Design a protein with these regions (language model features):
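A short, hydrophobic C-terminal helix/tail in secreted or cell-surface proteins
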Residues: 177-181
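Short linear sequence motif anchored by a di-proline
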Residues: 1-176
Length: 181
């Protein structure tokens, strides 16, 4: 489960992708975590924007005080879950990050591992949103991540962002292999 990530210079990283990013500053966050307002790419009829949105969805049907925000959705079951099946068809987004953390557990401790691209280009992660909240979509881990954790975010290639955000198209993506760092 992806529960922490790093994002630096989000405006700079998306300048060629989005039309507007007026509400987002080029800050650095080395410990992005659920409940924070984080930059995501949304698509509108007049173009894509970079917006700050809270990580963690409390579904509209849930009673907020009784419901823990959902930070991840499994790609394998996203069409079946009440919390997500409408959102994947109507409100897709893309989170921007430098890399993400996963923790390897042993009997004695948890050790953090940081995953990023070897070329240091940003990761564009598939997500969904509702109102002003979003969650990341995860998949089974690639071989390099699997040694640490059994899940990883669904990472889109740059040329897959437009297709993913196009609600007329089915969700598809290329599985990117990340090194362990």
């Amino acid at each position: 489960m992806c529960g922490r990530y790093v994002i630096t210079k989000p405006v700079e990283k998306t300048v060629k992708i989005v039309k507007s990013s007026t509400t987002v500053k080029d800050d650095e966050n080395f410990n992005a975590h659920p409940s924070q307002a984080l930059p995501i790419i949304k698509s509108y009829s007049n173009g894509k924007t970079l917006e700050l949105v809270k990580w963690g969805i409390v579904p509209s049907w849930a009673k907020q005080k009784d419901f823990r925000p959902l930070i991840n959705a499994r790609i394998e079951t996203i069409d079946e879950k009440v919390s997500f099946k409408k959102l994947i068809k109507t409100t897709r987004c893309v989170a921007v990050m430098d890399g993400f953390y996963e923790w390897k557990r042993s009997k004695e401790s948890k050790t953090p591992f940081y995953f990023t691209r070897e070329d240091k280009k940003p990761l564009y992660v598939a997500g969904i949103f509702e109102n002003n909240e979003f969650c990341l979509i995860t998949e089974e881990a690639s071989q390099n991540v699997m040694d640490v954790h059994h899940r990883q975010p669904v990472i889109l290639d740059n040329n897959e962002i437009d297709n993913y955000l196009d609600l007329k198209k089915a969700v598809s993506y290329t599985h990117l292999t990340l090194p362990t760092t």
